[in-house]
C-alpha cells in the first residue's frame, strides 16, 4: 500500500509539470517587479484676462493681443508652459481664477485685499496712473478733491481695482458710479454725455479714442485719482496651481524683467 501512495504522488507531480509552465510555482517566490508610474502629462495652464487696451484685448483678427499679452507670451514660452489665453469680462475672469486650479489671471493689481487669494508673479507692467477724464467741453466741472466727484456720475469697469478703491472712499454703484462689464462702452457713454467722468489710464483712453476715430483733444484729465506706483500689475495664480509651474513662471518673469525695461 505504501508503494502505491508513493507512485501516486510521483504521478501527480509529473502530470502537473506537463500541464503548468515549469516556472509557475517558482514565480510566486520571486520578488514582484516594481511598477514605476509614468510622469504626469504637462499641465495645461488656463490663462484668463479682460479687455483693457492697450495692455490686453482682442484684436481685429480675433487674437488676444496687447502690451501685457505679448509679455505674457514671452514669459510663459520661456518657462516652457503649455497654456491657452481667453478673454472674459473682469468679474468672470476673477471668478474663474479664484475657483479653478491651474489658472492664471493678468493684468491684475496686487492689493492687500487680494493678497491672500492668489499666488503672485510680479511685476508684469510698469506703474500706471488713473485719472478722472471729462469732455474738454465740460468747463462747468471743477474738482478740487476726489470727494467733489461724488456729485457727478463716473463710468468704470465693474469689479475692477479702481471700483474697489472708490467703494472704499464712499462712492456707490447706481448713485455716482455707472458700472459696466464692457470696457468699450465707457468711452461711448462719456462722449454721449451719459456720464460725467470716465476713470482709466491715459494710455487706455487714448487707445479707446483712436479705435473710434475720435481726436484725443476731446477729453482731458480732471483729476488724478491714484498713482499705482506701489501696486504693480501682475500675473496671479489660483493657490492650488502646481507650485513648480508657478516657480517656473516666476523665474522666467524675473529674467525677462532683468533683461528688458517694462513690457
Please report, for each region that a protein language model flagged, where it lies by residue.
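Bacterial N-terminal signal peptides
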Residues: 9-21
Amino acid at each position: 500500500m505504501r508503494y502505491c501512495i508513493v507512485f501516486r504522488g510521483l504521478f501527480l507531480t509529473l502530470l502537473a509539470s506537463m500541464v503548468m509552465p515549469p516556472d509557475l510555482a517558482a514565480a510566486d517566490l520571486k520578488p514582484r517587479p516594481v511598477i514605476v508610474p509614468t510622469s504626469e502629462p504637462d499641465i495645461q495652464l488656463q490663462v484668463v484676462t479682460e479687455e483693457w487696451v492697450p495692455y490686453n484685448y482682442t484684436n481685429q483678427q480675433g487674437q488676444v493681443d496687447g502690451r501685457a499679452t505679448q509679455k505674457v507670451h514671452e514669459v510663459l514660452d520661456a518657462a516652457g508652459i503649455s497654456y491657452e489665453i481667453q478673454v472674459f469680462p473682469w468679474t468672470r475672469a476673477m471668478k474663474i481664477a479664484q475657483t479653478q486650479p491651474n489658472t492664471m489671471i493678468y493684468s491684475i493689481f496686487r492689493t492687500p485685499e487680494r493678497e491672500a487669494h492668489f499666488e503672485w508673479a510680479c511685476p508684469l507692467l510698469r506703474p500706471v496712473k488713473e485719472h478722472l477724464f471729462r469732455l474738454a467741453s465740460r468747463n462747468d466741472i471743477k474738482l478740487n478733491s476726489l470727494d467733489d466727484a461724488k456729485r457727478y456720475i463716473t463710468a468704470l469697469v465693474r469689479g475692477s481695482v479702481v471700483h474697489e478703491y472708490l467703494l472704499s472712499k464712499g462712492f456707490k454703484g447706481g448713485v455716482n458710479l455707472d458700472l459696466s462689464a464692457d470696457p468699450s462702452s465707457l468711452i461711448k457713454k462719456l462722449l454721449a454725455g451719459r456720464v460725467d467722468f470716465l476713470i482709466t489710464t491715459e494710455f487706455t483712453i487714448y487707445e479707446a479714442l483712436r479705435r473710434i476715430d475720435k481726436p484725443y483733444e476731446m477729453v482731458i484729465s480732471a483729476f488724478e485719482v491714484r498713482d499705482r506706483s506701489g501696486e504693480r500689475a501682475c500675473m496671479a495664480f489660483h493657490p492650488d496651481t502646481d507650485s513648480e509651474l508657478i516657480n517656473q513662471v516666476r523665474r522666467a518673469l524675473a529674467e525677462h524683467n532683468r533683461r528688458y525695461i517694462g513690457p
